[in-house]
Regions:
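Conserved N-terminal ligand/cofactor-binding loop architecture of enzyme catalytic domains
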Residues: 55, 59-88
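Flavin (primarily FAD) cofactor-binding/catalytic cores of flavoenzymes
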Residues: 2-50, 54-56, 98-218, 222-480
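A conserved beta-strand/loop capping segment in the N-terminal third of enzymes
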Residues: 75-108
């Protein structure tokens, strides 16, 4: 199936979708893939971009996904699905090479290729479709979606309206730029980029005399390593600065990984809001640390460059905050730094900066601004999210709105983790069908979190009295 689709006539409220998805990243792609196996469930998913591409600026050669290949779009909910990573390999006659490679973790570029394969063959995905507005239609008791179909240049080609009984928002994250560096990032021609755009600027960075990488997570480590490997010994000209007190490894012990299970997600969701807000920043090594292999590769490369005497022209400094930033008269960049433990301050001159400063959840309430009066919020004005990943709404709105990767404050560190994608998709779909279509295990971890263990309402992972059951007669998408 091609991702380029001709416009179809807008349907009326007499033919609503059971579920309309806004955004097609890995999480909504997972949901679409699992929904494809459910008879009589009418779904369609919409994405403004012309095609699927997963973090294209960070598909560095050799960079690996930090979860096993079993954490694909569907396997942990339905390993017999045609959309598994193993079936992707089979379709490309690569099963035996993969088997002999004995790889549990695949490269990012391969994960991206797998997802693009699914996006090209899975029906009901509408790329080049911009959702303009979402409203609740009180007369029809349906969500009303206005959309614009875009041509290859991004210009409007067709406008339409559709209706759905339920929505799922998968609008993803956006690069985070620390406030002191925003003026430089927003100035054209200034060599300050976010790591999300690294590959686009890689050749220019390799030709630059001195580069500073800011940020200590996996992306920062991969960018630093790639620059280090491709710059001449003795003339590396690299600084790596991080606010964390150390270049710390990611927590990857077997029991530590149980923080990325449905058991922990349920436990976390049941905690008081104030406790949840304290926990997430304390758990930074669960999701902001560096893979052991990457740290080893960096140290090995640095050590290799000492074999002929001397030290590489690199500086790695943790515990540093960028207070302010600007440009010098010589058109270089000047960062004003402060060391957290010493209390000392210094001026750092460089020619280019790569910000590996992470991502922030996009505000989900902007895309559904017309529904803002109906959204129930917590003490910090964030949308409240229930156990089944639904925004808590005023009862006047009868249809549910689900969210993907926008609920770390409600479901913990596992919210953006690819390993929970299939499980969360199954939970959402089970709540949409009369009977659970993907039975889920009531227990998923050896760790018992809390003195009063939390258990799902049933083995299917939903509470029957909260289920939103929809029926329809066919699976044809009606939007787009």
């Amino acid at each position: 199936m091609s991702t380029a689709q001709p416009p179809t006539p807008a349907a009326g409220p007499e033919q609503p979708l059971d579920l309309a998805g806004i955004g097609i990243g890995p999480f909504n792609l997972s949901l679409a893939a699992l929904a494809h196996g459910i008879p009589c469930l009418r779904t369609a998913f919409y994405e403004q971009r012309p095609a699927f591409h997963w973090h294209p600026g960070l598909l560095i050669d050799g960079a690996k996904v930090q979860v096993p290949f079993l954490a694909d779009l569907v396997t942990l909910a339905n390993p017999t699905s045609p959309w598994t990573f193993l079936n992707y390999l089979k379709a490309h006659e690569r099963l035996f090479p993969f088997y002999n490679a004995e790889r549990f973790h695949i490269e990012r570029a391969e994960y991206d290729a797998y997802c693009r394969w699914v996006s090209h063959h899975l029906p009901g995905l509408h790329f080049g479709h911009q959702i303009d507005a979402v409203r609740w239609n009180h007369d029809h008791l349906l969500f009303e979606l206005d959309y614009t179909e875009l041509d290859a240049t991004g210009e409007a080609r067709h406008m339409g309206r559709g209706y759905a009984r339920a929505l799922v928002l998968g609008v993803g994250t956006e690069p985070h730029v620390p406030a002191p560096l925003c003026p430089l990032v927003d100035t054209p021609g200034v060599p300050v980029i976010h790591s999300a755009d690294y590959l686009e600027h890689r050749e220019a960075l390799l030709a630059t005399g001195h580069v500073t990488v800011v940020g200590s997570g996996q992306s920062g480590a991969e960018v630093f390593l790639d620059l280090l490997r491709n710059r001449p010994p003795g003339a590396e000209g690299l600084h790596w600065l991080t606010r964390t007190p150390a270049f710390a490894p990611m927590e990857y012990s077997k029991l530590g990984l149980e923080h990325f299970t449905p058991d922990y997600a349920r436990y976390f969701h049941a905690l008081p809001e104030c406790v949840r807000d304290q926990l997430v920043p304390r758990q930074w090594q669960l999701y902001k640390g560096i893979a052991h292999d990457t740290m080893t590769d960096i140290h090995d490369e640095l050590y290799r460059r000492t074999r002929h005497g001397g030290w590489p022209d690199t500086v790695l400094t943790p515990g540093v905050t960028v207070r302010t930033a600007g440009r010098t008269a010589a058109a270089r960049l000047e960062l004003h730094l402060e060391h957290a433990q010493q209390g000392a301050r210094s001026r750092h001159i460089t020619e280019a900066v790569v910000l590996a400063t992470g991502y922030r959840e996009r505000r989900i309430d902007t895309i559904i601004a017309a529904l803002d009066p109906y959204i129930r919020r917590d003490s910090r004005e964030r949308p409240r999210i229930d156990e089944h990943h639904r925004i808590v709404l005023d009862p006047i709105v009868k249809g549910p709105i689900y969210v993907q990767n926008a609920q770390r404050h409600a479901h913990g560190v596992g919210a953006p983790d690819l390993g929970l994608a299939a499980w969360r998709s199954a939970v959402i779909l089970n709540s949409l069908t009369t009977e659970p279509v993907y039975p889920l295990p009531p227990r998923t971890a050896f760790t018992t979190f809390g003195l009063q263990p939390t258990h799902p309402g049933s083995a299917a992972g939903h509470l029957p009295e909260q289920r939103d059951s929809f029926r329809s007669s066919d699976t044809q998408a009606i939007l787009g």
